[in-house]
Amino acid sequence: MKKQNNLRSLAAQAVEQVVEQGQSLSNVLPPLQQKVADKDKALLQELCFGVLRTLSQLEWLINKLMSRPMTGKQRTVHYLIMVGFYQLLYTRVPPHAALAETVEGAVSIKRPQLKGLINGVLRQFQRQQETLLNEFATSDARFLHPGWLVKRLQNAYPTQWQHIIEANNQRPPMWLRVNRTHHTRDGWLGLLEDAGMKGYPHPDYPDAVRLETPAPVHALPGFAEGWVTVQDASAQKCVAFLAPQNGEHILDLCAAPGGKTTHILEAAPEADVLAVDVDEQRLSRIYDNLKRLGMKATVKQGDGRYPAQWCDEQQFDRILLDAPCSATGVIRRHPDIKWLRRDRDIAELAKLQAEILDTVWPRLKPGGTLVYATCSVLPEENSAQINAFLQRTPDAALSETGTPDQPGQQNLPGAEEGDGFFYAKLIKK
């Protein structure tokens, strides 16, 4: 492998772009993976996800072992040392190889003069590892979450916040949704077994399958033909609450990448579905999913706050609003969220959610159903949001989900092995 494609230096650059520049790992990682051999892609992904998952600990260690922070053009070395710590703590990479490759990464980022520094810090960590980890275990950094988020979770869930944090720090299972228009779930599980893999049906979600071991999608029976889709079990519950019917006019708002759009059409193949998302670049993901599953829907770019951008005065039988949110329920799947979000974002997101709810509600027919969903665990975006909406919207009533005192249903991360999700089913009187 060429030196400029040193895995450790690429991982360091990816983490730096997330933490320092506010870019999402899903945007940063794919171009970097193109620079390494296929056999190395999984390790590069593991290093990036792992460092972001444990960033608080790795930062704490650097502060203990270095007298001053690295700044300016040397900042990438800061993250390269983190990659070294992560390998020594959490991977099966032999320590000598972890050190050698991490030190060599300095050459790839054109900082060869710092090889000795990197080597010295990593070896010092090896010598002091037990003492350092014992001290870390009593520090605030041990939660592996930013302090503002820990405080919000403590306030919202006084008896459950530690369980939420522990779930967020775990690796997520791989959930699939079997396309019922092609196969029964049991039938597809048989095909999976024939392919040498094992899956488990979810007891409550009729299309959901959890893989015993995560696998690349191209290895899944019939993935290219649309027999199965990658989607967390908790996300599949949105369409169960929506209960779409054939012949209905249905709006999927904030629809990208299209997982719920296609789920609606699997449940009601003859429904007339309009999928709308504000991000024009992500519309291609909706088209790709529709094409792979052999389905048709109308797809438009538009802001949920301005319905005139994407439809005329028509009303819908059902609306699924998967609202823009903090994504604090899917941290285990996207650990970069911890470092991309800021405390001030929550109030801004809650304001945006309220605006979308208020402007889309008139587009729902009397007697129609609106399902409001987020992948957040914060009450400001969930139960408090719906409570405020019900108070200012006389023709809205809660159905199936929660009580007037606690509107909506909150799934916490790890519950039934799913992501953290919130749902509120509203009926228009």
Curated annotation (Swiss-Prot):
Its main location: cytoplasm. It is found in: Cytoplasm. Its EC number is 2.1.1.176. One of its GO terms (molecular function) is RNA binding. It is an enzyme of class 2 (transferase). One of its GO terms (biological process) is rRNA base methylation. It comes from the Bacteria. It catalyses: cytidine(967) in 16S rRNA + S-adenosyl-L-methionine = 5-methylcytidine(967) in 16S rRNA + S-adenosyl-L-homocysteine + H(+). PROSITE patterns: NOL1_NOP2_SUN, SAM_MT_RSMB_NOP. Belongs to the class I-like SAM-binding methyltransferase superfamily. RsmB/NOP family. This is Ribosomal RNA small subunit methyltransferase B.
